[in-house]
Amino acid sequence: VSIETGAVRTDAQETFTGEKSMELADSALAALPDILRQCESRELAVFLDYDGTLTPIVARPELAVLADDMRATLDRLAKRCTVAIVSGRALANVQNLVGLDSLIYAGSHGFEIHDPKGGKLHHEEGGEFVPLIAKAAEALKAKLADVEGVIVEPKTYALAVHYRLVSDVDVPRVEAEVDAVVAAEPRLRKTGGKKVFEVRPAMDWHKGRALDWLLQALDLDRPDVLPVYVGDDETDEDAFRVLVDRGLGFIVAERPVQSAASYRLNDTDEVKIFLERLESHGKGEQA
């Protein structure tokens, strides 16, 4: 089954105009009774980032392995409600890491979406950027070859340059090289994250757009549905803003931070506790 982006409603832009001011998110576990009461009266739909949300932040991207007990929690939750992973990782990569056919996967910030029946979405404008990303990746690999610790990770529709293992003195050079590549190609743009610079298509498509599209495509954009999004990074803020007045956003952070999310979970352990509680209170069981 192939789902085309043309199905997105024409007024989708309106979804993003009522942005929530950035405030300190409240503790989710402290507010759990109220959150669960909302789940009892509405159909639940859960959307989750991967890195830093389902797995702890690690030094190298390939080390972010999903724990067996977290996978089991996701599998149980997917029997109760729609569960989707919305990740900056390439679709095939994140799907392989999670390893559950019962989930929906949105990779590359939503440029690639895979549903449980085998359908795949490629944003209709995304294909033209693939060779640009590949060219940028090769250029940065060459320019940064002598920088110890840097990891250039091509992801089809995006490119991540990880500098977590780079010495502080070399980080400005890494950023300068990324900036130079982006400046040379106006169809690309740079975004940031946790110890990473990302090169992405310069178009209005991100996790927030992907979340909005998924809600519509899955017939979950209804008043009786409670969409929940959990994420830990800058790119997840777009999704949090989509759920203002529509659902609940949860940022994963060890200390209070400014966020468009309403609630905060300390770490992946609290994420697991939260998902387990949602599983036991989800409305109905999927066929």
Predicted regions and their residues:
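Non-catalytic pre-domain segments flanking phosphatase-related domains
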Residues: 1-50, 54, 58, 69, ...
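Hydrophobic "anchor" residues on beta-strands that sit immediately upstream
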Residues: 45-47, 104, 228
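Active-site phosphate-binding/coordination module
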Residues: 65-155
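A general structural motif
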Residues: 41-43, 80, 102, 156, ...
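Conserved Rossmann-like nucleotide-cofactor binding loop
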Residues: 53, 91, 235
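Conserved acidic, metal-coordinating active-site core of Asp-based
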Residues: 139, 147-229, 234-243, 247, ...
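Mg2+-dependent phosphoryl-transfer enzymes with acidic/Ser/Thr/Gly-rich catalytic loops
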Residues: 16, 21-29, 41, 120, ...
